[in-house]
From Swiss-Prot:
GO MF term set: alpha-amylase activity; calcium ion binding
GO terms for biological process, alphabetical: polysaccharide catabolic process
Catalytic function, reaction form: Endohydrolysis of (1->4)-alpha-D-glucosidic linkages in polysaccharides containing three or more (1->4)-alpha-linked D-glucose units
Keyword Calcium: yes
Cofactor entry: Ca(2+)
UniProt similarity note: Belongs to the glycosyl hydrolase 13 family.
Known EC number: 3.2.1.1
SMART domains listed in its UniProt record: Alpha-amyl_C2 (SM00810)
Co-factor remark: Binds 3 Ca(2+) ions per subunit.
Classification via InterPro entries: A-amylase_bs_C (IPR012850), Glyco_hydro_b (IPR013780), Glycoside_hydrolase_SF (IPR017853)
Protein's name according to its UniProt entry: Alpha-amylase type B isozyme
Name of encoding gene: AMY1.5
Alphabetically ordered keywords of this record: Calcium, Carbohydrate metabolism, Germination, Glycosidase, Hydrolase
Keyword Cell cycle among record annotations: no
Source organism per UniProt: Hordeum vulgare (Barley)
Amino acid sequence: KAPGMIGWWPAKAVTFVNNHDTGSTQHMWPFPSDRVMQGYAYILTHQGTPCIFYDHFFDWGPKEEIDRLVSVSTRHGIHSESKLQIIEADADLCLAEIDGKVIVKLGPRYDVGNLIPGGFEVAAHGNDYAVWEKI
């Protein structure tokens, strides 16, 4: 079960990495810029209703990376109440399977090959995240 609102009441949870109220535009309390895509890998593949921050999509430049994650989510019908199974959770790794169709790795651990079952291929990856989809 996921922590917080998405674990407690996923149908009502709205997830986001940044928005105009977090002060990111004024650089007051921004989400760490080197972790933004890790955040999107999480919210676009997990429970809840994800919101993409306009500035991240149109101004920052990771539009293609975000598009790939949205495509995976759409292709596999991930929704606010998708089934989440935590495969591994450590200080350097969070590995989860969603609806038996998508696997998400967050964290710096690189060697997770023995944890990924056969029949999955990498669909998206970046700084400390990777997403596999069932083929």
